[in-house]
Amino acid sequence: MTDKYAVFGNPIAQSKSPFIHTEFAKQTQQDLSYEAILAPVDQFDSSLVAFFADGGKGANVTAPFKEQAFSMCDELSEMAKLAGSVNTLFNLPYGKIGGDNTDGVGLVNDLEMLFGSLKGKRVLLVGAGGAARGCILPILQHNVAQLIICNRTHEKAEQLQTLFNEYGNFFAKPIEELISPFDLVINSTSAGLSGQLIALPSVIVDETTDCYDMTYSQQTTVFNQWAQAQNARKTADGLGMLVGQAAKSFSLWRGITPDTGSVMRKLRESLAQEAID
């Protein structure tokens, strides 16, 4: 019998998750289906419960439901508890729901594949929303020398410092106090999707700095355009993070780790074709 999986979001038509997980299933010979489900904003909980009641084995969750999914879980991983949100759900016995957050694992795996080991690096994390919170612990666990977080609203960054400072060398700094280059700058904000960019001092990037945008698009993202203008060493978008977090979800569900490289290549080709069309 084919096992059922899905991703819930609103909007959801743009989701690459069905393609990614279908490709993973093909390469690992797993008998499963994976669909995108548009959940009404005020009916996510009932949509998820109905999916699991109908035999769904597991689900991914994207905006705007990650925090709501967190609150519905009966069992949570330590990563999910600290992230305060989940993107991966499990249908447990007796009608219970389990939750995990694989975003941070997807990010750090992509960062180290692109830029080398994080160990000993000075890292700046731009933004203090849910995307940032889900990635702080995995970054600190990779033995960075220092992780600085900045945000338009400094108080939000300070709240995350209080939550995570026991896990490593982690500090919140006002944007105006950023006065020297970092080894790695990560943009966790989605402002670039609407053509916006947080005003960052150019001094944080030089020719030795790698820059990473958690968002992705057919063209170079607004943040990466800015980074390239500051002569950054390398820039990359978040497509690898997307595939990486999906691979971690898949391995948690199926007990097998898929190859991400071939799926990344197909997605890049698809995005390039969309840009032409």
From Swiss-Prot:
GO cellular component: cytosol
HAMAP family tied to this protein: Shikimate_DH_AroE (MF_00222)
Presence of the UniProt keyword Oxidoreductase in the record: yes
Pfam family, one: SDH_C
EC numbers for this chain: 1.1.1.25
GO terms assigned for molecular function: NADP binding; shikimate 3-dehydrogenase (NADP+) activity
Originating organism: Shewanella frigidimarina (strain NCIMB 400)
SUPFAM superfamilies in the record: Aminoacid dehydrogenase-like, N-terminal domain (SSF53223), NAD(P)-binding Rossmann-fold domains (SSF51735)
Name of the protein this chain belongs to: Shikimate dehydrogenase (NADP(+))
Active site residues per record: 66
Catalytic reaction(s) noted: shikimate + NADP(+) = 3-dehydroshikimate + NADPH + H(+)
Free-text function comment from the UniProt entry: Involved in the biosynthesis of the chorismate, which leads to the biosynthesis of aromatic amino acids. Catalyzes the reversible NADPH linked reduction of 3-dehydroshikimate (DHSA) to yield shikimate (SA).
Keywords: Amino-acid biosynthesis, Aromatic amino acid biosynthesis, NADP, Oxidoreductase
One GO process term, biological-process aspect: aromatic amino acid family biosynthetic process
Binding, shikimate: 15-17, 62, 87, 103
Subunit composition and interactions: Homodimer.
Binding residues annotated for NADP(+), in chain numbering: 78, 127-131, 151-156, 238
Enzyme category, top tier: oxidoreductase
Family: Belongs to the shikimate dehydrogenase family.
Keyword Metal-binding on entry: no
Pathway: Metabolic intermediate biosynthesis; chorismate biosynthesis; chorismate from D-erythrose 4-phosphate and phosphoenolpyruvate: step 4/7
